[in-house]
Curated annotation (Swiss-Prot):
Family the UniProt entry places it in: Belongs to the BcsE family.
GO biological process: cellulose biosynthetic process
Known function: Required for cellulose biosynthesis. Binds bis-(3'-5') cyclic diguanylic acid (c-di-GMP).
Keyword Nucleotide-binding listed: yes
Gene name of this polypeptide: bcsE
Secretion signal, residue range per the UniProt entry: none
Lineage: Bacteria, Pseudomonadati, Pseudomonadota, Gammaproteobacteria, Enterobacterales
Domain of life from the UniProt record: Bacteria
Keyword terms, alphabetized: Cellulose biosynthesis, Nucleotide-binding
Protein source organism: Klebsiella pneumoniae subsp. pneumoniae (strain ATCC 700721 / MGH 78578)
Protein name: Cyclic di-GMP binding protein BcsE
Keyword flag Nucleotide-binding: yes
GO MF annotation: an example: cyclic-di-GMP binding
Annotated InterPro entries: BcsE
Disulfide bond positions: none
């Protein structure tokens, strides 16, 4: 008869804690101390005659395991693994060499951040290999993973439903923990998309009393989880609205949603990356029924920022120019919609999309051509929206090297070069209708006073054709910037106000002839 093991959380019903042989369960825990405690309580929850093996990574088992004589199996096979990826690869072979794995429960306590430097492909391959191994030997395998960013491992594992019998996370919420079950298969059936409150204290892990009778919502399509700033001080508009003070609280509430509307607020450019991670996590983990909306409270989003948020999984980005009534109309317009765009598994890929050109300022002629060509041929970027290239010819009497000294790009990805008596600029992700505004920020003087002629390319095929022509220019016709002045410039009684230097005269008293005598 096959054995059925149990997870070490008291009062859980069988459907979400039983682990029969032949399956693999993966449990993410965001704090290592909680992972160790749950590891020990799971050992203690097994029957006296159970066959259990404890695998500790990066530590000695005797330093981790803490059991009394009244709980747990009579015998526990102990194993230790070095904190190296190679140890995880060889774990299956090493276990077979040490014992007969049939009807065993293997509990692996991973070292903190053990999977951090292992890519998603290798992680999924290891899970699939472990699943085949557990099915062949008729044993159960529980992996407890602790990491600062458990979503990094959770997201790629969501597609491993054929290999994992269970996938869940335990996240610390101040005085309690959330037991977030993506799915959990047992001998009693399978349960999915459950969020349970659990407590951890000196008595161990147990289901919170109010969670024992709480009913999981079947549909939250009418629910709206919003940042309080979105309503601009107005109270909740109906019983379906729930307001939160921070985006972090909105994100944590959205983790339990299925089809609700999630409203984030953004006030400054520095929030972009974190907000993008929140949106990406919700979209990958909670599905396509969520309506995720970002409202810009103050003008802070560039075109690249908006594209990053939409690529991360946002359904809509509401600009700061939209009034509250217009904002509510836009929120209503996305109801009953399903998100259909493809979202990459790795958020780092999206960051690469938004900043593909990590250069700024002057580049040599050949380096400029190579950089622009790489951007244009990047298939991950949207077509005909990669940027604008403009060639400027100086006005009569002005050398192109002198015009270069006036060119001061501030954005990463804006580069320029000089050659063939032209100043050529490439402004990444700049729209053609914003070109004049961008040039006014780059040059301190009107471009009409500095340059006599300009040519603009904004479509991919146009820019690529011009790059081919530019690569044919002989190096002898490449211009070089003016040499920097050498020596120390000693400015007396002068201050810089951020734009130019200003000298302050020193007072000198004139003397008369009588005083000189």
């Amino acid at each position: 008869m096959d054995n059925v093991f149990t997870l070490g959380i008291s009062s859980l019903w069988d459907e979400v804690c039983h682990m029969p042989v032949g399956g693999v369960w993966w449990l993410n825990v965001d704090r290592y101390a909680d992972a160790v405690s749950l590891f020990n309580q799971t050992l203690a929850a097994q029957a006296k005659n159970s066959h259990v093996a404890a695998l500790v990574m990066g530590n000695k088992p005797k330093d981790i395991i803490s059991l009394d004589h009244t709980h747990g199996p009579d015998n526990i096979a102990l194993f230790t693994l070095p904190n190296r990826p190679q140890a995880l690869e060889e774990i299956h072979r090493d276990l077979v060499c040490s014992l007969e794995p049939g009807n065993y429960l293997f509990i692996l306590l991973c070292a903190e951040n053990a999977w951090q430097n292992i890519n998603n492909e290798k992680l999924c391959a290891w899970v699939e290999k472990t699943s085949r191994w557990a099915q062949y030997h008729r044993c159960a395998f529980l992996a407890i993973n602790s990491a600062q960013d458990i979503d990094r491992q959770l997201t790629p594992l969501l597609r491993e439903y054929r290999s994992l019998s269970g996938l869940a996370s335990i996240r610390y919420q101040g005085d309690r923990h959330i037991f977030d079950i993506a799915w959990w298969g047992s001998d009693k059936g399978i349960s999915a998309q459950q969020q349970l409150m659990v407590q951890h204290d000196d008595a161990g892990w147990r289901l919170a009393q109010d969670a024992e009778t709480s009913v999981q919502p079947r549909s939250d399509e009418k629910a709206i989880l919003s940042h309080v700033r979105v309503l601009e001080g107005a109270p909740p508009l109906s019983e379906y609205w729930t307001l939160f003070d921070t985006n972090d609280e909105v994100f944590n509430a959205g983790r339990t949603a299925q089809a609700a509307t999630i409203l984030f607020s953004i006030t400054q450019n520095t929030q972009i990356e974190q907000l993008g991670r929140y949106i990406h996590t919700l979209r990958r983990q909670r599905g396509t029924a969520l309506k995720i909306i970002v409202r810009e409270q103050t003008p802070s989003l560039r075109a690249t920022d908006e594209r990053l948020l939409l690529s991360s999984g946002a359904s809509l980005v509401i600009p700061s120019s939209a009034s509250l009534s217009r904002c509510l109309t836009l929120i209503e317009s996305v109801q009953n919609q399903k998100f259909s765009r493809h979202i990459p598994e790795d958020f780092a890929t999206l960051l690469t999309w938004s900043q593909p050109l990590k250069l700024r300022g002057y580049q040599k002629w050949d380096a400029f051509c190579e950089a622009v060509h790489n951007v244009m041929t990047n298939t991950l970027l949207p077509p005909d929206s990669k940027g604008v290239m403009v060639a400027l010819r100086p006005a009569p009497g002005l050398r192109v090297e002198q015009a270069l000294t006036l060119c001061k790009p501030n954005r990463m990805g804006d580069i320029m070069t000089i050659g063939n008596n032209r100043l050529v600029l490439f402004l990444s992700f700049c729209r053609i209708n914003d070109l004049d505004t961008a040039l006014n920020h780059i040059f301190p003087l009107p471009t009409g006073d500095i340059f006599s002629n300009r040519m603009v390319w904004f479509e991919d095929k146009q820019i690529l054709s011009e790059i081919v022509i530019m690569r044919g220019v002989e190096p002898a016709r490449w211009n070089t910037p003016l040499p920097l002045s050498v020596g120390k410039n000693e400015t007396i009684n002068a201050t810089h106000d951020g734009r130019h230097w200003r000298r302050y005269p020193e007072p000198h008293r004139l003397t008369t002839r009588e005083e000189q005598a």
